[in-house]
């Protein structure tokens, strides 16, 4: 039987500014007899097969990329050996090349649950990582991102969520929460988190205000700015004698409901 080919990695992307063509380059994969080239309109959009090349080729020029935006072209390469397919490469795009692995840029073509899964996966790494080295940013292009089964985007240390629209009305997000980094709901160490320039949409009837609220339970170095908040806002994580919070800087924000 055929050996399963190794996973490859896309290492480079270049765009021809005259023709718009985009050229990707990848690493040779052990046991690969050919490579399938896939393209999507976003990191978490639907990847479709656009071409297949032989194993002696480790670059591909897409002469007909999506032209609605040069940035709406994300690529994956799959190594193939006969009827045995290898694991897909990680996605690559002009945005990833420009901003690096720890900045995620989303657009309206992306699967909304996949976005939630990634944001909350990163939160799992960052929740208690007060002295860690990793930094993350999630940038949302104009669109509505509320159609997700996730309760909210949870954000921890060294994480930024930002809308890329001209106004906060251009990006609609379901909800954001900052779970306490210390015991007893104490958020006095919830530092170094930032949210800005989007709408927090009211998608529930608001009857369970404690769970439905925008929870900006933070300490210093945690700005929330230029938001349009349709939900009730809570500035603490939970009730209790030791459930301390120390504010959090909020500016240039419109609240449609109670804050406290």
What does each model-identified segment do?
Residues 101-104, 108-160, 166-178:
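N-terminal extracellular ligand-recognition/capping segment immediately after the signal peptide
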Residues 62-85:
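Beta-strand-rich modules
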Residues 36-68:
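Recognizes extended acidic, P/S/T-rich segments that occur
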Residues 1-31, 83-98:
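Pro/Thr/Ser/Gly-rich low-complexity, intrinsically disordered linker/stalk tracts
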Residues 141, 162-167, 174, 196-201, ...:
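Feature marks extracellular polysaccharide-active and adherence modules
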Residues 33-36, 73:
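Short beta-strand/loop motifs in extracellular/secreted proteins, especially
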Residues 101, 229, 240-260:
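Predominantly polar beta-repeat domains that present long G/T/S/D/N-rich surfaces used to bind, process
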Residues 116-123, 135-136, 149-151, 174-190, ...:
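Extracellular beta-strand/beta-solenoid scaffold signature
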């Amino acid at each position: 039987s055929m050996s399963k080919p190794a996973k490859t990695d896309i290492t480079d992307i270049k765009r021809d500014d005259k023709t718009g063509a985009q050229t990707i380059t990848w690493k040779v994969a052990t046991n690969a007899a050919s490579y399938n080239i896939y393209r999507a309109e976003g990191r978490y959009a639907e990847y479709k097969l656009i071409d297949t090349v032989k194993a002696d080729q480790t670059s591909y020029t897409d002469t007909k990329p999506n032209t609605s935006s040069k940035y709406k072209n994300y690529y994956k390469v799959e190594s193939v050996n006969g009827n045995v397919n290898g694991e897909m490469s990680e996605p690559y795009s002009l945005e990833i090349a420009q901003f690096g692995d720890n900045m995620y840029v989303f657009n309206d073509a992306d699967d909304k649950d996949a976005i939630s899964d990634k944001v909350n996966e990163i939160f799992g790494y960052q929740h208690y990582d007060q002295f860690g080295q990793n930094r993350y940013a999630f940038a949302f292009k104009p669109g509505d991102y509320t159609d997700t089964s996730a309760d909210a985007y949870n954000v921890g240390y060294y994480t930024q969520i930002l809308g890329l629209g001209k106004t906060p009305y251009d990006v609609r997000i379901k909800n954001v929460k900052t779970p306490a980094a210390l015991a007893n709901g104490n958020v006095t160490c919830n530092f170094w988190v930032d949210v800005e320039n989007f709408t927090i949409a009211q998608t529930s009837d608001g009857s369970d205000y404690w769970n439905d609220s925008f929870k900006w339970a933070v300490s210093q170095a945690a700005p929330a700015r230029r938001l349009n908040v349709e939900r009730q806002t809570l500035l603490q994580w939970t009730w209790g004698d030791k459930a301390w919070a120390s504010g959090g800087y909020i500016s240039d924000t419109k609240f449609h409901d109670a804050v406290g």
